[in-house]
């Protein structure tokens, strides 16, 4: 019989007590269910199944908070119940589109405000206040044809143009064979007197494209023929029309880089600007190509009227003369003179 001391018995007793206390904490027990071992990945959750009607507690962990879609079958009942209606989807889409439109509108307003601020700051703040110079802001293109301004009327005599054009028209009519045969020479109207102009109009035509814009100047007491809108002690402004000279713009760009047009080419073409008046002097004060055009009407009798058109630059230059006459209750036009026919 083996002798066991009290010390060994005491050690065995303590070891048994300690192991019985520690092992339940450190060792995981494996439970058996249905004859199969439980998957250790789903100790704290239930494994997924292929049953579409299973509860949420038995679903796949990847779709715990969202409905799953079965492969090869229609969407689950929960998924169908959670689908948004067409009206709700349309409302969401409209809200997103409205938000985008508001954002785009804010961006456009910001860019436009920055552009206007920069233009006004340079035009008024720098050129008018600092440099004390005149500045011009173009707004929109305008027609090349315009009425004579008050300043133009002081430099051009409309009565003189009317009288000279009347003489030139009578000269042309007296040389025409149709007028000589049907009305005779010297030409007389129904009252037996020399025909006179009954209606006459004058206007300007710029050769260069024109724009309408705002002119700014420092506010001063200097007299001017123009009507100004004023902000006292700040600046004054008015609306005006100005031509855009492409050749002058090119000259300015070349001068900025210390190159002149004479270094590149030299073209002399007075016919382009002054036509047949290349040996005449232009009107003083004009810094761009400007034509003064006129249209006149002269009656020969109750059924016959002469209409003529031309340009004025120191002298009158006729472009066209038409005769309008009523024949068999119809208005017939005869072209008596046309400038292109003589070239």
UniProtKB/Swiss-Prot annotation:
Residues 54-63 have a biased composition (Basic and acidic residues). The chain crosses the membrane at residues 108-130. The keyword Transmembrane helix applies. Coiled coil: none annotated. The keyword Mitochondrion applies. One of its GO terms (cellular component) is mitochondrial membrane. Residues 67-84 have a biased composition (Polar residues). This is Altered inheritance of mitochondria protein 39, mitochondrial. It comes from Candida glabrata (strain ATCC 2001 / BCRC 20586 / JCM 3761 / NBRC 0622 / NRRL Y-65 / CBS 138). The gene is AIM39.
